[in-house]
Amino acid sequence: MNENNKNNSSEDLNNNNNNNNNNNNIKKTHHRYSAKYKHSLVPSNVGNSGLSGNGVSQKELMSTFKYKSTRTPRLKIEPTIDNLFPSQSTSKSKSNTTNSSPITIMKPKVSKSISNYSNNKYNNNNNNNNNVSTSTSTPIPTTATTTNGNNIDSSLFTSLNSIQTTINGKQSTMIPFSPYSLINCLNSMSSLDENEINNLPIFAPILPPINQQSVNDLNNNNKNDNNKNDNNKNNNNNNNNDNNNNDDNNPTTKKKKVKSQYYMESLAERLSNSNSNGE
């Protein structure tokens, strides 16, 4: 019994030594096993690493660590217009100040002749900050009366002022209008007949003029294409006829035809002779 106890005690010591060696190996490579063996990541002055069951809890071991983050915490700033769009005059600084000057909106230069459409929303401020110049053309008449006396909603005409705009040296045409005005105009037109609608010059300034010469050129091109197709068909037919004639004049095909004709003639002659001879 005593020998067995000695053997058991010696085996326990060996097991403890093996456990300590394993713990030391885990300490050396703790960056690989940090997620699985957190209890091994302890300072050396705490004693054993906790694997041998010395009564040190996991919470007590981890409480010895003092993690200090080097990152500065994020500041909770309310998303206001001033914070999202600071003025260009404010210099960028690292101070955590949320007060800034109000945002400055770049306003295009728009002629006063369309102030009814813009409701004085735009003004001529900040003219030096943009390269947009506008000039209005002759506005469309604001009244339209049909032959039967029906008045069409004029709100469409008041907003259809064609604006010639020059942006960076390139000239373009803008036609601002309200979709509600267009709907009202179409509703007013629903009671008109076809002739009255065709006689209304409402959308004439918007549509580009038709170039009749371009239409004629297009028709001529189509005619030329059709003529080319007809000529190609005729050429193909002529080529086929030439090929057939060449077959007749070809000596090899001529011999074949002669042999076949000779065979048929001789066969017919023999048949006639046999019938006449009673065979």
From Swiss-Prot:
Name this protein carries in UniProt: Putative uncharacterized protein DDB_G0268234
Region (Disordered): 1-27, 83-153, 213-260
Source organism per UniProt: Dictyostelium discoideum (Social amoeba)
Listed Low complexity bias regions: 1-25, 86-151, 232-250
